[in-house]
Amino acid sequence: MASLIFTYAAMNAGKSASLLIAAHNYKERGMSVLVLKPAIDTRDSVCEVVSRIGIKQEANIITDDMDIFEFYKWAEAQKDIHCVFVDEAQFLKTEQVHQLSRIVDTYNVPVMAYGLRTDFAGKLFEGSKELLAIADKLIELKAVCHCGKKAIMTARLMEDGTPVKEGNQICIGDEIYVSLCRKHWNELTKKLG
């Protein structure tokens, strides 16, 4: 039985690398995969999933108004798809998460979504919130704080190291993101008042 799986972690835990390795395992066995990523993710490449360890793969772009279920039906008509992979799934819209679950339930094809759980302010992303609610299986990858403890939070810093307290939830640009344990994240956010 296929499942909708959400693999989540703070920044720099290897989410994209895990996705690319899992997709490679399918392809190595002669199976076809569908790799997707939201259009808003342009940091490393517009049309590829790129891992910080240097591996990458071409991806299909998801726009905010795209019906992923309909796109899957079109792609499936071209070739049998054995697994769907979604990088940066936190950026999905609620309805798009439900479209992923429809792929699982209608076609019995596994969907593996990877992303952040929370933003720099500790708030759930829309896509992550829905995935946490309806995924069949949740997997947490471990990121490491500078103190050596498990990092579950992400902080946003300006290039000069100044922490950011407020702002848009999604910001791809001059900011730097660091993974922190809850203790160090709380200490950082308290400094901001």
UniProtKB/Swiss-Prot annotation:
Keyword field: ATP-binding, DNA synthesis, Kinase, Nucleotide-binding, Transferase
Pfam short name (any one): TK
Q: Which domain of life is it from?
A: Viruses
Which GO terms of the molecular function aspect are on file? Answer: ATP binding; thymidine kinase activity
Extract one GO BP annotation from the record.
thymidine metabolic process
- Keyword Zinc listed? The answer is no
Q: Which SUPFAM superfamilies match?
A: Glucocorticoid receptor-like (DNA-binding domain), P-loop containing nucleoside triphosphate hydrolases
PROSITE patterns this protein is in?
Answer: TK_CELLULAR_TYPE
Judged by the first EC level, this protein's enzyme class is transferase
The yes or no answer to whether the keyword Transcription is present is no
EC number(s) stated in the UniProt entry for this protein: 2.7.1.21
Where along the chain is ATP bound?
A: 9-16
Q: Which reaction does it catalyse?
A: thymidine + ATP = dTMP + ADP + H(+)
| Record-stated family | Belongs to the thymidine kinase family.
What's its job?
Answer: This thymidine kinase is one of the enzymes that catalyze DNA precursor synthesis. Although tk is a nonessential gene, some strains of host E.coli do not support the growth of phages that lack this gene.
Know the name of this protein?
Thymidine kinase
